[in-house]
Amino acid sequence: MSRSLGIPVKLLHESSGHIVSVEMKSGELYRGSMIECEDNWNCQLENITYTAKDGKVSQLEHVFIRGSLVRFLVIPDMLKNAPMFKDVRGKGKSASLGVGRGRGAAMRAKGTGRGTGGGRGAVPPVRR
């Protein structure tokens, strides 16, 4: 089953090879070079400066971080110019009808719906 990736996950993949900071839900902080990152935010870092909750700092060579334990990531500012953001800005309001979640917008735009028409406030048909 193929899914399209959201902007945050794409940005995470773009950060491979750059220095990132990863704060864990437990309060620990890892700062190092991102080797690889997965869609579920599992990350591999190398040459890490690890800061424990109590402030003690140590150096680590290589770590694997479980994505579900990550609170947030800090990535380099240079990635704000990544090509994925240019696509988002260029779209504007010229989207075609019916694009989005569900059918509501397409049905309203066409003026049709389910059933024989009518609904609240409409005059019911006269039966003979």
Swiss-Prot record:
Which SMART domains does UniProt cross-reference here? Sm (SM00651)
Organism superkingdom:
Eukaryota
Query: In what ranges is there compositional bias, type Gly residues?
Result: 112-121
Q: In this protein, which residues make up the domain named Sm?
A: 7-79
* One Gene Ontology term from the biological process aspect of the record: mRNA splicing, via spliceosome
* Region feature (Disordered): 90-128
Localization (cell): Cytoplasm, Cytosol; Nucleus
| Record-level Gene Ontology MF annotations | RNA binding
* InterPro entries xrefs: LSm4/Sm_D1/D3 (IPR027141), LSM_dom_sf (IPR010920), Sm (IPR047575), Sm_dom_euk/arc (IPR001163), SmD3 (IPR034099)
Q: Which Gene3D superfamilies match?
A: 2.30.30.100
UniProt keywords, alphabetically? Cytoplasm, mRNA processing, mRNA splicing, Nucleus, Ribonucleoprotein, RNA-binding, Spliceosome
Question: How would you summarize where this protein is expressed among tissues?
Answer: Expressed in young seedlings, roots, leaves, flowers and immature siliques.
Q: Which PROSITE patterns match?
A: SM
One GO cellular component term of this record is: cytosol
Main location as per UniProt: cytoplasm
> Keyword Nucleus: yes or no?
yes
Disulfide linkage: none
Q: What happens when the gene is disrupted?
A: No visible phenotype under normal growth conditions, but the double mutants smd3-a and smd3-b display embryonic lethality.
Q: Which Pfam families match?
A: LSM
Tell me the function of this protein.
Core component of the spliceosomal U1, U2, U4 and U5 small nuclear ribonucleoproteins (snRNPs), the building blocks of the spliceosome. May play a minor role in the splicing of cellular pre-mRNAs.
Regarding protein family, the annotation reads: Belongs to the snRNP core protein family.
Stated name of the protein: Small nuclear ribonucleoprotein SmD3a
